[in-house]
Design a protein with these regions (language model features):
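Conserved GNAT acetyl-CoA-binding A-motif
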Residues: 1-2, 182-193
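Short, hydrophobic/aromatic alpha-helical segments in well-folded domains
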Residues: 89, 107-111, 174-179, 195
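Residue-level detector of anion-binding/catalytic polar loops
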Residues: 69, 188, 205
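A conserved beta-strand-loop-helix scaffold within acyl/acetyltransferase catalytic domains
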Residues: 1-168, 213-214, 246-253
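Conserved acetyl-CoA-binding loop-helix of GNAT-fold acetyltransferases
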Residues: 165-182, 191
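C-terminal catalytic domain of photolyase/cryptochrome flavoproteins
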Residues: 81, 88, 94-97, 185, ...
């Protein structure tokens, strides 16, 4: 069982499954002071500490001064040419790291045909030509970490790639543009996945996630259970350590 809520986890433990606790990094569309959704991207920036706010503004300025603009497309507004360009970028990202892409063009063709409304593409253009892009998934499905409300719209990201190198373009395409889109469209949360404490500088904060597992071999299951107990203590300490590194301003700052 993956990404269950507390009730799911309790039921699984009662059934004899072994719980595992991990950490992901999520952004919430919620002002830390008022609790209301952010009014716009500037409102989000204003909630950050001065150094984090300054760094993001510098990054965005570099991309703008490089002559790069962005185009957003969702669902059927993502054209076949857009999907083809995305796959070129996606494939290049993997090849640059010496790996073959694990999703095929046929997969994305199926997504465009059967689940178009669940995808948003951010295309970076310079001189009228596309040079990079990122792709996020969007869903109102509550099947994600923590058992969130079904009425919430959640974004999941992201795939990315570039055919040209531009300073800070990765941050703009993968974080600033998607977060801006989420704010404008009332998305409750952007789940950035596991790993990467650097995501905290973009206000993606650590969140505990939960899974449960069963192994048929008693000896192997016992060894894994002992490991998970040690790992759980480490995860608790890790979350406590990260808790003091919030990028948001304190109420009195």
């Amino acid at each position: 069982m993956l990404f269950g809520d507390s009730d799911d986890l309790t039921a699984c433990e009662e059934a004899g499954l072994m719980p595992r606790h991990q950490v992901q990094f999520h952004w919430k569309n919620q002002h830390p002071a008022s609790g209301a959704p952010f009014a716009d991207f500037d409102d989000f920036l204003a909630a950050l500490t001065q150094d984090k706010r300054k760094k993001i503004r510098q990054e965005r300025r570099k991309v703008l001064e490089a002559g790069v603009t962005f185009r957003w497309a969702r669902g059927t507004d993502i054209t076949p040419a857009d999907w083809a360009f995305f796959y070129r970028c996606y494939e290049r990202t993997y090849l640059e790291h010496g790996n073959a892409p694990y999703l095929s063009p046929a997969f994305f063709d199926a997504m465009a045909r059967d689940m178009a409304s669940h995808w948003v593409l951010f295309v970076a253009e310079r001189g009228g030509a596309p040079i990079a892009c990122s792709l996020i998934a969007v869903s109102a499905d509550p099947a994600s970490a923590g058992g969130q409300n079904a009425s919430e719209t959640v974004a999941y990201g992201r795939y990315w790639g570039a055919l040209e190198r531009v300073d800070c373009l990765h941050f703009e395409a993968c974080y600033h543009q998607p977060l801006d889109w989420c704010i404008r469209h009332g998305v409750a949360r952007f789940e950035g996945g596991a790993q990467g404490e650097h995501k905290m500088a973009r206000a993606l904060l650590p969140v505990a996630t939960h899974s449960a597992h069963w192994l048929a071999h008693p000896g192997f299951a016992d060894a894994v259970a002992r490991f998970l107990a040690r790992e759980s203590a480490g995860v608790d300490g890790y979350l406590e350590q990260l808790d003091g590194r919030s990028p948001f301003r304190r109420p009195d700052a």
